[in-house]
């Protein structure tokens, strides 16, 4: 090596050392001024690995890449009687099963504790608030998040978060944009705290029709655009079928489209049954995925497992699986193993898992569910 080359190398090394010293100095100063964890290297941040909360429906967990992401904002919207509240009550039950604490901000004043208990919610330990104004509701949400003791907060619903000015005014007064301003301010305030605390916040929202829309979708959600931007996951839930036995209606078939997902591939679709008084049919979700992964075979109306017929018709097969828990648990274990390995699911209940690197995240989260 020539003398000139050695000088250049020494110059680069000394320059690199000076940069590292300057960087460590400024990082230390930032942490002293703003607290530990205010700035970090991405590779050192274990909290950047997104954990999930199960939705209670295996097909939807798969569509979301494991479930609702922890420490994020989630929006669930859809028409009336489509299963929005049921979906969140199942999430609350899942959190409580794992020893977590959940809160339900009932702005609509319509929570049914008997129905919640039938879905597996521990109503004795569920935190419930029925606020008078939108400001009060969002302030309660913010304080629950800041406490770092709550794992899940559900707000039902954004449309019912009425600004104080509107409540104190006369009926018929126009308070234009007040709810949108309220939501925009709230999202700016709570989003950072949500990420630090690891609390998941689910906002339920209603649909409205935009006036004068000739082309395109006239539907929109209430509360302005802030929630759409701040939400990491947005779920569009619809009722696509009413389930009947003869003339008796006993449930609905729901379809959920993942309209936005920042932590897994978006635009996946999941379907599942919601039974009146019982909630999401977990066995129905299992049967759908078992059929699509060829663990349970359907020929005509008959379903068979390992070459033996187990039921005629979907309803009878679900009943048979519920009565034979050992086989049901075995089928569930095989299904989760196949999905972890990336087996394609190609029918209506879940769009296919493509062979791409993003699905490694999904596989890891499904392992946690299993």
Curated annotation (Swiss-Prot):
CDD domains xref list: RecA
Record region (Disordered): 1-20
InterPro entries: AAA+_ATPase, DNA_recomb/repair_RecA, DNA_recomb/repair_RecA_CS, P-loop_NTPase, RecA-like_C, RecA-like_N, RecA_ATP-bd, RecA_C_sf
Cytoplasm is among the record's keywords: yes
Origin superkingdom: Bacteria
SMART domains on file: AAA
ATP-binding recorded as keyword: yes
SUPFAM superfamilies: P-loop containing nucleoside triphosphate hydrolases, RecA protein, C-terminal domain
GO terms (BP aspect): DNA recombination; DNA repair; SOS response
Keywords, sorted A to Z: ATP-binding, Cytoplasm, DNA damage, DNA recombination, DNA repair, DNA-binding, Nucleotide-binding, SOS response
Subcellular location: Cytoplasm
One of the record's GO cellular component terms: cytosol
Transmembrane segments annotated in the record for this chain: none
Record: residues binding ATP: 78-85
GO molecular function: ATP binding; ATP hydrolysis activity; ATP-dependent DNA damage sensor activity; damaged DNA binding; single-stranded DNA binding
PANTHER family the UniProt entry points to: MITOCHONDRIAL DNA REPAIR PROTEIN RECA HOMOLOG-RELATED, RECA
Function: Can catalyze the hydrolysis of ATP in the presence of single-stranded DNA, the ATP-dependent uptake of single-stranded DNA by duplex DNA, and the ATP-dependent hybridization of homologous single-stranded DNAs. It interacts with LexA causing its activation and leading to its autocatalytic cleavage.
Protein family according to the UniProt entry: Belongs to the RecA family.
Entry protein name: Protein RecA
Source organism: Prochlorococcus marinus subsp. pastoris (strain CCMP1986 / NIES-2087 / MED4)
């Amino acid at each position: 090596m020539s003398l000139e080359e050695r000088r250049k190398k020494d110059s680069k090394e000394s320059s690199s050392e000076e940069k590292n010293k300057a960087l460590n100095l400024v990082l230390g100063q930032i942490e002293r001024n703003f607290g530990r964890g205010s700035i970090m290297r991405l590779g050192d941040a274990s909290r950047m690995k997104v954990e999930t909360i199960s939705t209670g429906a295996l097909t939807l967990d798969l569509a979301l890449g494991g479930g609702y992401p922890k420490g994020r904002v989630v929006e669930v919207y859809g028409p009336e009687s489509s299963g929005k509240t049921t979906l969140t009550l199942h999430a609350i039950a899942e959190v409580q099963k794992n020893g977590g604490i959940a809160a339900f901000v009932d702005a609509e004043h319509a929570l049914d504790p008997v129905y919640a208990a039938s879905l597996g919610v521990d109503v004795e330990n569920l935190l419930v608030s029925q606020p008078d104004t939108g400001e009060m509701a969002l302030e309660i949400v913010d304080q629950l998040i800041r406490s770092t003791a709550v794992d899940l907060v559900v707000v039902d619903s954004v449309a019912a978060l009425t600004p104080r000015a509107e409540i104190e005014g006369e009926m018929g007064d126009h308070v234009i944009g007040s709810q949108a301003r309220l939501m925009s301010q709230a999202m700016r305030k709570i989003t950072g705290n949500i990420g630090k605390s690891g609390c998941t916040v689910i906002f339920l929202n209603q649909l409205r029709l935009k006036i004068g829309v000739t082309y395109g979708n006239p539907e929109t959600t209430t509360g302005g655009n802030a929630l759409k931007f701040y939400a990491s996951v947005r779920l569009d839930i619809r009722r696509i079928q009413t389930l009947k036995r003869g003339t008796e209606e006993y449930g609905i078939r729901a379809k959920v489209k993942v309209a936005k997902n920042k932590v897994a591939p978006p635009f996946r679709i999941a379907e599942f049954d919601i039974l009146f008084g019982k909630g999401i049919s977990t066995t129905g979700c299992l049967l759908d995925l078992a059929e699509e992964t060829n663990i349970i075979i359907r020929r005509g109306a008959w379903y068979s497992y390992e070459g033996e017929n187990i039921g005629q018709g979907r309803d009878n097969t679900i009943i048979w699986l519920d009565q034979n828990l050992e086989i049901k648990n075995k089928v569930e274990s095989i299904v989760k193993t196949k999905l972890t390995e990336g087996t394609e699911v190609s029918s209506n209940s879940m769009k296919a898992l493509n062979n791409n690197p993003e699905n490694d995240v999904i596989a890891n989260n499904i392992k946690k569910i299993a």
